[in-house]
Amino acid sequence: MRSGDAEIKGIKPKVIEEYSLSQGSGPSNDSWKSLMSSAKDTPLQYDHMNRESLKKYFNPNAQLIEDPLDKPIQYRVCEKCGKPLALTAIVDHLENHCAGASGKSSTDPRDESTRETIRNGVESTGRNNNDDDNSNDNNNDDDDDDDNDDNEDDDDADDDDDNSNGANYKKNDSSFNPLKRSTSMESANTPNMDTKRSKTGTPQTFSSSIKKQKKVKQRNPTEKHLIDFNKQCGVELPEGGYCARSLTCKSHSMGAKRAVSGRSKPYDVLLADYHREHQTKIGAAAEKRAKQQELQKLQKQIQKEQKKHTQQQKQGQRSKQRNVNGGKSAKNGGKSTVHNGNNINEIGHVNLTPEEETTQVLNGVSRSFPLPLESTVLSSVRYRTKYFRMREMFASSFSVKPGYTSPGYGAIHSRVGCLDLDRTTDYKFRVRTPQPINHLTNQNLNPKQIQRLQQQRALQAQLLSQQQQQQQQQQQHHSPQAQAQASTQQPTQGMVPNHFPGGATNSSFNANVSSKQIQQQQQQQQHKSQDTGLTPLEIQSQQQKLRQQQLQQQKFEAAASYLANATKLMQESNQDSHLSGTHNNNSSKNGNNNLMTMKASISSPNTSVNSIQSPPSVNSVNGSGQGVSTGINVSGNNGRIEVGIGNSVNPYNGRIN
C-alpha cells in the first residue's frame, strides 16, 4: 500500500506495516495493479479435476462440468419430454427418468434394442470425433462462397436425416439412431478444440477462421507493350508492370499520371479529349431523356384535361337529372335547384392568372388595417376629447377669407372624437390651416399644369385683395374732400374758386387713373401668363413689380390723407377764431390767400415752395399761439412731398389731437 492511500483513508501506520506485502524487506509495491502482469503470465495450475478427489468428496452419480466458462456446454434436447440433457446423461435419462417412456413396459424388446443402440452411439462418440474433425478441416480449406454453400447443403441433409429418423422412430424401427445428429455436433464441438460459430449457426474451427482472411483485390499488372498510354493510366506499379486503368484512374495521383512517359500529347490534353468524347455521349442521352420527359408531361396534361372534361360532362348530366327530378316534388325541387346553382358556379368559375392573383393579394394587403387590442395610454380619453373640442371650437370661430377652407373639422365633428384616416397611428390630431378651395378638378392635368394653376390662383387672390383695399381707401378720401370743398367755398366767396378744389380733385383723379392702369396691366399680365404659361421665376419677378407699384400707391394715398387732415384742422381753427371775435377780416383773408397759394404750389410739384413751409399767419394768428404747424417740405427736383402735421391749440392754450 502507498503512503498516499494511508493518508487519504486514515489508516494507521502500524496497520500498514503489518499488512504490507514487502514486510520491510525490499521496496514496497505501489498497488495491486503491479501484480496484474504476473497473474496473466502464470499458467493455470489445475486443467482438470482429480478423479480421486471426486470419488472421495462426491457421490458416484454426481457429474461435474470441467471448465464451464472456457468451453461450450454440449447438450441435447430429449424429443419425448423436451428436457435439455448432457451427452453423458442421455442414456440414464432414457432408461430411468424420461416421462415419455414411463407409460410403456420396460420388457418391450424394441425399447431394449433402442437403448443398446444409444449406448453404442455414446461409446462410439469418442472414436468418431477425430474423423469428423479431419473432415471439417478439409472442408474449411475452400473459399467463402463454397463454405456457405456446403454449410447450407449440410443443413439440408441434416434436416432430411432428422425427418427420416423421426419417421423411423415413430414406426418403432430398430435401426433408428436418435444420436446421429448429436454425434456430428459433438465431433465439431469437442472440448480439446477451439470452436467458433459462423453466421449460419454451423460450428467452425479456429484454424478455418485464420484461413478466411479477405485479400485486397488488385488489378493485374500488365506489360508495357500491351498498354495504350494515350487512353490508359500507365503508372508503374511497385509489384512490376503498369496500371491498365483509364485516364480517370482514382488510385494514382495526377502528378504520377503527368510524369508517365510515352504519351503522344500531354496528360491534360488527353484527359480533356476523353471528357469531351464521353460528354457528347452523355449529352445525347440527356437530350433523349429530356425529350421523353417532355412527351410524358404533354401526355399527362392531355390526360388531365380529358379527365376534367369528362367530370364537367358528368356534373352537367347530374344537374340536368336533378332539375328533372326537382319538377316532381317541391322539396326535392328546392334542394336540386340549390345544388344546381352550386354546380354552375363551380363550372363557370374563372381561372385567374398568377399576375391577377398577385394584384388581388397586394390590394388586400394594402387595404388591411390592423388595430391593436391594447395600446399605451398617455393621457385619459376625457382630457383628450376636451382638448380637441376646445381647439376645434377656437379654430372654427375665427373668420376665414372667401375661397379658403375652414381650419376646424366643423361644429359637429368637434364634439366627437374624430379619426384621421390618413394618419391613424398619430396620437395627436394635426392643426389644419386654411387652404384655397380647388373649384376645378385636377384629374386630367400634369403636375406642372397643376402648379401653374395654383400660382395663377394666388395672383388672382392678391389682386382681388388689392382692389378691395383701394376701393375702401377711395371711399374714405371722397368724404373728407367734399367737406373741405364746402368749407373753403363759404369763406372765400369766389376768391380763387378753382385752385384748392381743383388741386384736390386732380390728386384723387390721378390716384384713380394710376390704380386703374395698374389693374389693367395686371389683368394683361394674367392673360399673357394663362396663354403662354410662365415659369416660377417669371411669376416671382411679376409679383415683385406688383409690390413696388403697391408701395408707390400707398405713398400717394398717404400724402392725400395728410392734406385732408390739414384742411380739417384749418377749418376747426377758423371756426374757433370766428367764435372768439378777436380775429380781423384782414388776417383771415391773408390766411386764406396763403393757404390757396400753398395748395396751388402743392398741385404743381415742380415749383419751389420753400417760402411757404411756415407762414406766419398760419403758425401765429395776431401774435397769439393759436395756429397749425403744417411742416410741408417739397423738393423741387424729385417732386416728393413730406407733410408734417402738428397739434392745433385752442384759445385756452390746450392742445387738440
Curated annotation (Swiss-Prot):
InterPro entries, sorted: SCA7_dom (IPR013243), SGF73 (IPR037804), Znf_C2H2_13 (IPR041251)
Record's subcellular location: Nucleus; Cytoplasm
GO function terms (MF aspect): enzyme activator activity; structural molecule activity
Acidic residues composition-biased segments: 131-163
SS bond partners: none
Region named Disordered: 98-225, 287-353, 469-532, 572-636
Binding site for Zn(2+): 78, 81, 93, 98
Function recorded in the entry: Component of the transcription coactivator SAGA complex. SAGA acts as a general cofactor required for essentially all RNA polymerase II transcription. At the promoters, SAGA is required for transcription pre-initiation complex (PIC) recruitment. It influences RNA polymerase II transcriptional activity through different activities such as TBP interaction (via core/TAF module) and promoter selectivity, interaction with transcription activators (via Tra1/SPT module), and chromatin modification through histone acetylation (via HAT module) and deubiquitination (via DUB module).
One GO process term, biological-process aspect: mRNA export from nucleus
Protein name, UniProt field: SAGA complex subunit SGF73
